[in-house]
Amino acid sequence: TVRGLVTLHKVKSKYYMELPYSVMDAQMLLAARVSGISNNRDIIAGRMPHDPLLIRWSADDDKVSLHTVDCSAVCDSAESIAPGFERNKIDPVMQAFPIAAVSPDSSAVVIEVGSFFASDQKPFRPFLDASPLAKLFGLRESMQGKFQKEMSGVVSMQAFPENVNFRTRMVYTVYDHPFTAEMTV
């Protein structure tokens, strides 16, 4: 167990996050950075292959939802169109997590997050997006790979006063060869 902005727990081979209700609806950044890599043809350690996502958490009786926040259009809450604008601009759910437990004082919920952070979702992938110009000009395409879930997973976790880190090992098959990236999420 490590404590910080949220409390993180490791039980056997599962990783849990204890989210206080006080952080629900607070906007946060979700980002992944390459920490180590077995083939640096397209990307090197230290680089972020994808832009960070602005996220927020919400909870209901049986699940916690992770929403992506879209700030591309905003409306002043004092404007007469604000209620209609808000109904047509809800934050989409990126992932939902069943509530595994509730803290003894009912101030937080516990969810299993290891399988999410070590998944082959775009924000966590070590590969750059394919360039539409590469094909047009006959340039080399970006590396892509087939995810090997059974060989991938969380390596470690850390909690700090203002953020948390999960270190993951992401294993792929690229051009019939093994490829491994360690990511810090």
Task: Map each language-model feature to its residues.
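Auxiliary tRNA-acceptor-end handling modules of aminoacyl-tRNA synthetases
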Residues: 1-185
